[in-house]
Amino acid sequence: MLDLGLSKMALIGVVALVVLGPERLPRVARTAGALFGRAQRYINDVKAEVSREIELDALRTMKTDFEQAARNVENTIHDNLREHERDLNAAWNSAVSPGGSAAADAPDGPSAASGELSWRTIATAPAKRRNWRVKKAVTPVWYKRATMRRTQVQSGAARVARHRPASLRRPARFL
């Protein structure tokens, strides 16, 4: 950076006054100040853009690292689940089949032998079609009452009067 002290600035001002003259010096100083301000704004914009790009690059790398870690965790979980499912199928097949060891050596999954059954396929029963009326009858009465559109609205005072015991009611007077 330039080392401009007060004495050097004064020397530059005197030289500019001599060269430009007192009439044009204020106009040139104003123009120089405007150009200097524009240059500073441009430099600040470039600095901000560079810092934003650096932050975005850091965020991108963090995002890729996070996604990679998530994929690794997901793969680990799936591998563990597959291993446990294989163990369960082997235990199930050894318990179901009379031989035991022959069924446990067979591969699992869709390529398995047609006689071999998975614990998952036996445990899940086929979905039965429910009757519409039975399904509607299952809805609780309190829920129907709470969600029903009210056709008769009663004020709070009328509700209190309706539930007040007869012994506490005032006698109704007409005229």
UniProtKB/Swiss-Prot annotation:
Q: Which residues cross the membrane?
A: 1-21
Instruction: State if Transmembrane helix is listed as a keyword.
Output: yes
What keywords tag this UniProt record?
Cell inner membrane, Cell membrane, Membrane, Protein transport, Translocation, Transmembrane, Transmembrane helix, Transport
Q: What is this protein called?
A: Sec-independent protein translocase protein TatB
Per the entry, what this protein does is: Part of the twin-arginine translocation (Tat) system that transports large folded proteins containing a characteristic twin-arginine motif in their signal peptide across membranes. Together with TatC, TatB is part of a receptor directly interacting with Tat signal peptides. TatB may form an oligomeric binding site that transiently accommodates folded Tat precursor proteins before their translocation.
Q: How does it assemble?
A: The Tat system comprises two distinct complexes: a TatABC complex, containing multiple copies of TatA, TatB and TatC subunits, and a separate TatA complex, containing only TatA subunits. Substrates initially bind to the TatABC complex, which probably triggers association of the separate TatA complex to form the active translocon.
Compartment(s): Cell inner membrane
Q: Superkingdom of this entry's organism?
A: Bacteria
Its membrane topology is listed as: Single-pass membrane protein
The GO terms describing molecular function are: protein transmembrane transporter activity
Residues covered by region (Disordered): 96-115, 153-175
Q: Which Pfam families match?
A: TatA_B_E (PF02416)
Look up the record and report any one GO term of the cellular component aspect.
TAT protein transport complex
For this chain, the family text in UniProt reads: Belongs to the TatB family.
Mark out the compositionally biased spans (Basic residues).
Answer: 160-175
Name its GO BP terms in alphabetical order: protein transport by the Tat complex
